[in-house]
Amino acid sequence: LEDEAAEAIVHVSLGDLRKAITALQVAASLSSTVTRDLIYETTATAPPEELHGYLLACKEDGFQPARRRLKGLLDKYGLAGTDMVNQLHRGLGEVAFLDEKQKLAVTEAMAETDFRMVEGGGEALQLDAMTATICSLIGK
């Protein structure tokens, strides 16, 4: 078990020992060396830096690059749309390149997206709308 893998287990388990044990068991069943990347891939969790990268793409690159980055995250980590929104929300407080006002506006956009998806709105369209809104709120 690599040190970074242990930190990843703490991150994905959110203090739930059962989740931590399950994450370790699944990763160990696939490889004799449990790595950070393996933990994130097997728990359908995007690493914090990947989520920050998506928000940075919204800020600096615009809609299409941010949209591609989001799709890549969903595909690579097997995330459902609501999981993506929840993980983004969880990590938003640590995004240094956004001020408090921007974080508030992004939180509102994520909440609206989550609500619409839970109510049955199409995931792809809702995530695109969220990306467009975030780009408008924090973009150059």
Language model: regions and residue ranges:
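Residues at alpha-helix boundaries and the short loops/turns that link adjacent helices
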Residues: 16, 30-33, 45, 60, ...
